[in-house]
Amino acid sequence: MATSKVERLVNLVIALLSTRGYITAEKIRSSVAGYSDSPSVEAFSRMFERDKNELRDLGIPLEVGRVSALEPTEGYRINRDAYALSPVELTPDEAAAVAVATQLWESPELITATQGALLKLRAAGVDVDPLDTGAPVAIASAAAVSGLRGSEDVLGILLSAIDSGQVVQFSHRSSRAEPYTVRTVEPWGVVTEKGRWYLVGHDRDRDATRVFRLSRIGAQVTPIGPAGATTVPAGVDLRSIVAQKVTEVPTGEQATVWVAEGRATALRRAGRSAGPRQLGGRDGEVIELEIRSSDRLAREITGYGADAIVLQPGSLRDDVLARLRAQAGALA
């Protein structure tokens, strides 16, 4: 898989910061991840020139000098003293907020600054990945973002409805294997938790506080009724509500899964072997897995395709089959 541009630039910055001397272009091509993908010396040279210009545009002090007194070849390095940031320490909430903001900002005038800031933070060893921190970020107003680039098409509509205090109506399903049902909700805010978006609000149909994953909401979200009809109750902690909903705890249930011989190593490690078994003429074994999150387990098993087959429970098997059919349909 080809290395992304941002990852390649981060690798280059780290390499040029880690040396007191100068590194030749040839050494960079052979040792810095992302450049070995170049099909030719000419292609590498063009890519490297673009990357050098980009680093300079970002304000990174790239220096050029002779590799040694006996070697006239030019090399490159980054002046540590000029580049060094004062110590940057972000709390989990702050780190997650930075990462979420970069997902939301898409305007041309912001994207360069966003990528530049991320590049400097990551190269300085600052973790800004919400999937790693696991920290949730709550957004209760469309004013919190200037542009939307998320995969959830309904996010902008929900944020506008939250701003105006309008009730929303949409179709929703609890899992891929279940049918959609129409829900009428007083929206309070949206929260990102472990890379997913959730709507928190009062479900009028259930007369209770509910959490809805945005990826399970249908494409049509309709604001209904007058503006100002809903308010967020005082003292409501959106992040706490979502965290309690999605936190993985033992359910007491077990899944029985067949895995092909030599495949699905991570799944094998997580489970307990129940003995060898052939399935469809293939050698393998049956493993037992504790179900902490049915959704997460279904996603993981789906990723192994025909190398992992759910035997029990039926609900998990149906969920995995629905995901596989959806993937096959998308590729058709």
Curated annotation (Swiss-Prot):
Pfam families registered for this protein in UniProt: WYL
Top-level taxonomic group: Bacteria
PROSITE patterns tied to this protein: WYL (PS52050)
InterPro entries named among the record's database cross-references: CBASS_pafABC_assoc_protein (IPR051534), WYL_dom (IPR026881)
Loss of function: phenotype: Cells lacking this gene are not severely sensitized to RNI and display no accumulation of the proteasome substrates mpa, FabD and PanB.
Annotated signal sequence range: none
Coiled-coil features, chain-numbered ranges: none
SS bonds (residue pairs): none
Any one GO CC term of the record: peptidoglycan-based cell wall
Residue ranges constituting the WYL domain according to the UniProt record: 147-227
Biological function: Part of the pafABC operon, however PafB does not seem to be involved in pupylation or substrate degradation. Appears to play at least a small role in resistance to reactive nitrogen intermediates (RNI) in vitro.
Subunit: Interacts with PafC; with which it probably forms a heterocomplex.
Family: Belongs to the PafB family.
Protein name: Protein PafB
